Amino acid sequence: MLEKFTVIRGKAVPLRGEDIDTDRILPARFMKVLTFEGLGQYLFYDERFDEKGNPKPHPLNDPRYRGATILLVESGFGSGSSREHAPQAIKRAGFKAIIGESFAEIFFGNATAIGLPCVSLAPEDLGVLFRSVEENPELEVEIDLVNKEVRFGDRTAPLFIREEAREALVEGLWDPIGELLEAGELLDQFDRKLPYPRRTE
């Protein structure tokens, strides 16, 4: 059974900047892998480390945000190439959800398909959330996909997400391949009803 995403809670890390593309999220040279395992360590690598591998000032290197599981972004996040490695790197770095103003369409789809919810807030609400987290890194942020709300401090803001994506995440139907694997016996039954030659093993 795939995980059902109803309420996601955690600390957040603010990442300012519009139109952050997938090349920045995960530099292309780190895509030469056979699996997605370990991609999290290369998240925003060129912005977090210099050519010698020394840390640079960056929100993801800031100890105040250590342990954050929600990524705050601005508009146009995930633009550029359609590489699915980008959302994989974010998820494998420990993030459970992304809150932003808007997302590139292909990135949004790739993220949803691996169980990484991307929800949008109105610019005013997002601005308040950014400032709140920057002022208080320990602030707990709550994403309620059932009631379509983001809660933090004493504030509640409506979230926006495509309804089909929200339903898939809430019902645990976000991974088509996973659904097929879980439906093994049903597929076998269907296969036996087909008129053409079928596998016998």
From Swiss-Prot:
Q: Which UniProt keywords apply?
A: Amino-acid biosynthesis, Branched-chain amino acid biosynthesis, Leucine biosynthesis, Lyase
Amino-acid biosynthesis is among the record's keywords: yes
| SUPFAM superfamilies to which the protein is assigned, alphabetical | LeuD/IlvD-like
**Gene Ontology process terms (BP):** L-leucine biosynthetic process
Q: Which residues form the signal peptide?
A: none
Pfam families named in the record: Aconitase_C
Give the catalytic activity: (2R,3S)-3-isopropylmalate = (2S)-2-isopropylmalate
Record GO cellular component, one term = 3-isopropylmalate dehydratase complex
Q: Name one GO molecular function term.
A: 3-isopropylmalate dehydratase activity
Give the first-level EC class, as a single word: lyase
Quaternary structure, from the entry = Heterodimer of LeuC and LeuD.
Q: What is this protein called?
A: 3-isopropylmalate dehydratase small subunit
List the source organism. Answer: Thermus thermophilus (strain ATCC 27634 / DSM 579 / HB8)
Instruction: Report which gene this protein is encoded by.
Output: leuD
